Design a protein with these regions (language model features):
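Active-site beta-loop-alpha junctions enriched in small/polar residues
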Residues: 22, 51, 82-86, 113, ...
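Conserved N-terminal subdomain of the carbohydrate kinase-like
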Residues: 1-51
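Conserved phosphate/ATP/ADP-binding segment of small-molecule kinases
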Residues: 87-180
Length: 207
């Protein structure tokens, strides 16, 4: 079983996450153990995250097979980039592996840090030192456009935005771009939830 430990931050000291995922059942599975055509037989949507291909080369290959099968079967594929530097330890970089996988996804979720660290894409006109913990959503329209330009299969791009005031206070919002329209959520002040990860967008097909 893969587990993680959270050292909660205080005031200006950020929280720290420690991963213990080596030799977990999932990280050591063989790609040939799963029949993706059978698994996806009655499925309309496959969602994967960047945690999976980061765990091991076998896990990356399983993810690659799942996405390829979903593409062949006409199943919508969404991904959460979810970059975790500490997990990429088997000799391949996130950029090398994720570029191929994200290119075959129809919906991409991430934050500005994911896009920059994995793909080198930055929000135009954004200066983190000038934010004072507040995030201007319109600055990130360029991230959405750049990502969709790099990955033309993508039909929708979602960017989550967290402004860090201190270890105990964060602002939280998001933007969505569908290639034509740029949509923004309201901004929330989060004071009572540990920001280990974010709640994933629950995507539904438009009928």
């Amino acid at each position: 079983m893969g587990i993680l430990f959270l050292e909660t931050g205080s005031n200006v000291r950020p929280s720290q996450v420690y991963y213990d995922r080596d030799y977990s059942a999932f990280a050591t599975m063989s790609p040939n153990q799963l029949d993706w055509k059978e698994i996806l037989g009655d499925t309309r949507w496959l969602h994967w995250t960047g945690i999976t291909p980061a765990l091991s080369e076998n896990a990356a290959q399983m993810c690659r097979q799942a996405i390829a099968t979903a593409n062949e079967m006409g199943v919508t594929v969404s991904c959460d980039i979810n970059y975790r530097d500490n997990l990429w330890n088997y000799g391949k970089t996130a950029t090398e592996v994720m570029s191929e996988l994200v290119a075959k996804s129809d919906v991409i979720l991430g934050n500005e840090e994911d896009c920059e660290k994995v793909f080198g894409i930055k929000p135009l006109g954004f200066d983190a030192e000038q934010t004072k913990g507040q995030v201007e959503q319109t600055s990130f329209a360029s991230v959405c456009k750049q990502m969709m330009g790099r990955f033309p299969r993508c039909k929708k791009m979602v960017v989550t935005l967290r402004g860090s005031i201190n270890a105990n206070q964060n602002t939280w919002s998001g933007v969505l771009y569908d290639g034509r329209t740029f949509m923004q959520s309201r901004s929330y002040l989060i004071t009572d939830i540990v920001a280990v990860s974010y709640t994933h967008l629950r995507a539904h097909e438009t009928r």
